[in-house]
Amino acid sequence: MFDVPSLEDIPEDLRSRIKEVADKSGFVPNIFLSLARRPAEWRAFFAYHDALMDKETPALSKGDRELIVVATSAENHCLYCVVAHGAIARIRTRNPRIADQVATDWRSAELDGRQRAILEVAVKIAVEPWTVNDEVLGSLRAHGLTDDDIWDVGSISAFFAMSNRLARLTSTMPNEEFYLMGRLPRTPPVLHAGQMEAMEAMPWPVTWVWTHWMRVTSRFWRTVCFPGWLPAASSASSS
């Protein structure tokens, strides 16, 4: 519907921010380019996004914030936001199942009482804001949320209501990379025959450093980033 600008055609500060994201994730999320046709709005959009999503409080974690996005975006039928933020939710909650459950039916998802109360209020703000009153907000205070936390719940719901509609307006589809993010731990690259021969020809210190580094990083992703749900290869294949 709308032409998507190329990286070469957008202002340098936008290009620099997009490069930072690509360096961290390995790809450029499509929404970054879809919205770049309006640079001033792009800057305001992502500044507001970061202010809401990159902070954390005792009662409202980064993972909770992403679940708000997934639940409200599902209610608003926004494919891009459900898939993209579902991927981030899997990583930030360290729970590969929860984002799919929340996207499909958050009311039946494996949530604790605090998370369920947060999503109940967030969805009300997103789809029927006229029903939100002091009694509704009081349910969040009962779960330890401060007034600032409650403001964030409302702001995230409102901000992504706009984001959902912009994604639909621009027909922005999720990147393929989002679908596997947070589902499987990162593993060392598989060396092909020619690469193995090159490795064997290297001096032994280089070979030792390489293999040791791959072993350490693989263990890190399995035990630190995804503890408990993928203890061994057999567990992944049987699930």
PLM features per residue range, with description:
Residues M1-S239:
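Hydrophobic alpha-helical segments
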